[in-house]
Curated annotation (Swiss-Prot):
Can catalyze the hydrolysis of ATP in the presence of single-stranded DNA, the ATP-dependent uptake of single-stranded DNA by duplex DNA, and the ATP-dependent hybridization of homologous single-stranded DNAs. It interacts with LexA causing its activation and leading to its autocatalytic cleavage. It comes from the Bacteria. This is Protein RecA. ATP binds at G79, P80, E81, S82, S83, G84, K85, T86. Residues 377-386 have a biased composition (Low complexity). GO terms for molecular function: ATP binding; ATP hydrolysis activity; ATP-dependent DNA damage sensor activity; damaged DNA binding; single-stranded DNA binding. InterPro entries: AAA+_ATPase, DNA_recomb/repair_RecA, DNA_recomb/repair_RecA_CS, P-loop_NTPase, RecA-like_C, RecA-like_N, RecA_ATP-bd, RecA_C_sf. Its main location: cytoplasm. Pfam families: RecA (PF00154), RecA_C (PF21096). GO terms for cellular component: cytosol. The lineage of its organism: Bacteria, Pseudomonadati, Spirochaetota, Spirochaetia, Spirochaetales. It is found in: Cytoplasm. Residues 358-407 are annotated as: Disordered. Gene3D superfamilies: P-loop containing nucleotide triphosphate hydrolases (3.40.50.300).
Length: 407
């Protein structure tokens, strides 16, 4: 068939000729830029299933819509002081390490507590840590780690502490307008493509600042300009709701509200209210109980909780205590919840650090019904005092001064 000319570009008059022209263009592109530079979506492994790193909180996994933090993407966690931002990031590090991943922590604030990280389940002896002097150094280290292709998760704590070299070399009181914003914008442009190829999850922790002269609307904003807002696939806001205590007792935790402000992987603006226990992080058993009730795997009638028609406790604290004391049943419930929420994901328990030798391959039918009844009776008569979470700390860790690997 004949072709009409539009300038110097031939316009094909049939579908077959268009496809031939497109194939010739594809071959030329691949010759110039390499194999896989142009492909059809859904073919030639152009798009694979989204790989994730669980958050350590099954309720937050559900709110994110895909079961955790997506690999190969940039995540921003922000909020007021002492709201739980670093706790969220350390839980993600622990979950990545459980799955055999390599984690790095860029401590720009020079404030990471190894003991607290250990208590949250982080293998401190396997964690790579850097405490850079300048923001440029921190971001160059992050880029080098991403380019290596060997690191699964990197945490930068925090954006506000990425002090530009010009500011460090200057005097106190000197005005340095927009230096962090320019630094972040340049770094993120370089990092975006290599992060996706390396399947590394890069988490930026950020602080809040107040805008000057704002009369209407929310005066709060995050540091580092707006580049991070654009490049982040997921933005998570963490805020403290209340301090957890009973009467005159000493406070033992915080209740926090986690809101998904931006989500390119699933619908955004979902909210989760959860507990963070001092020195222990997420109340994992409480989160599992709430998720199981929501998915109707555990039945709640009045104050009683029941699993497979067997009562496991009267009141929330007693039901949580039952889960802590019966890890076989806890893993059954966790498997059922995760299978229902994320059927395509392989099951790896978030509780394996509590009982490392436990086999995760046992079917739900293999649990001992007598154990269920016996432990349920204990749970029903247990005291209603607050149930403490089981510690995940390993007693055989080395001294803190020698465990962290310095870059």
């Amino acid at each position: 068939m004949s072709k009409a000319l539009k300038g110097d570009v031939p316009v094909s008059s049939s579908f077959e000729e268009k496809m031939k022209a497109l194939e010739a263009a594809r071959l030329q592109i691949e010759k110039q830029f390499g194999q896989g530079s142009l492909m059809k979506l859904g073919k030639d492994d152009a798009v694979q299933g989204v790989e994730v790193i669980p958050t350590g909180n099954i309720l937050l996994d559900e709110a994110l819509g895909i079961g955790g933090y997506p690999r190969g993407r940039i995540i921003e966690i922000f909020g007021p002081e002492s709201s739980g931002k670093t706790t969220l990031a350390l839980h993600a590090v622990a979950e990545a390490q459980k799955r055999g991943g390599i984690a790095a922590f860029i401590d720009a604030e020079h404030a990471l507590d190894p003991q607290y990280a250990k208590d949250l389940g982080v293998s401190v002896g396997d964690l790579w840590i850097s405490q850079p002097d300048t923001g440029e150094q921190a971001l160059e280290i992050a880029e080098s780690l991403v380019r290596s292709g060997a690191v699964d998760i990197i945490v930068v704590d925090s954006v506000a502490a990425l002090t530009p070299q010009a500011e460090i070399q200057g005097d106190m009181g000197d005005a340095h307008v927009g230096l962090i914003a320019r630094l972040m914008s340049q770094a993120l442009r370089k990092l975006t493509s290599i992060i996706n190829k390396s399947k590394c999850t890069l988490i930026f922790i950020n602080q809040l600042r107040m805008k000057i002269g704002i009369m209407f609307g929310n005066p709060e904003t995050t540091t580092g300009g707006i580049a991070l807002k654009f490049y982040s696939s997921v933005r998570i806001e963490v805020r403290k709701v209340e301090t957890l205590s009973r009467g005159d007792e000493e406070a033992w935790g915080n209740k926090v509200r986690i809101r998904i402000v931006k989500n390119k992987m699933a619908p955004p603006f979902r909210k989760v209210e959860t507990e963070i226990l001092f020195g222990k992080g997420f109340s994992a058993f409480s989160c599992l109980l709430d998720a199981a009730v929501k998915q109707e795997i555990i039945e709640k009638k009045g104050a009683w909780y029941a699993y497979r028609e067997e009562k496991i406790g009267q009141g929330r604290d007693n039901a949580v205590g039952f889960l802590q004391q019966n890890m076989d049943i806890t893993l059954e419930i966790e498997r059922a919840v995760r299978t229902k929420l994320f059927p395509k994901q392989a099951f790896i328990s978030s509780f394996q650090e509590h009982r490392p030798a436990l086999s995760l391959e046992a079917s739900p039918e293999e649990s001992d019904a007598k154990t269920l009844r016996r432990x349920a009776s204990r749970g029903a008569g247990a005291s209603s005092s607050r149930v403490q979470e089981g510690s995940a700390a390993n007693d055989h860790f080395q001294d803190e001064s020698t465990t962290a690997k310095l870059l």
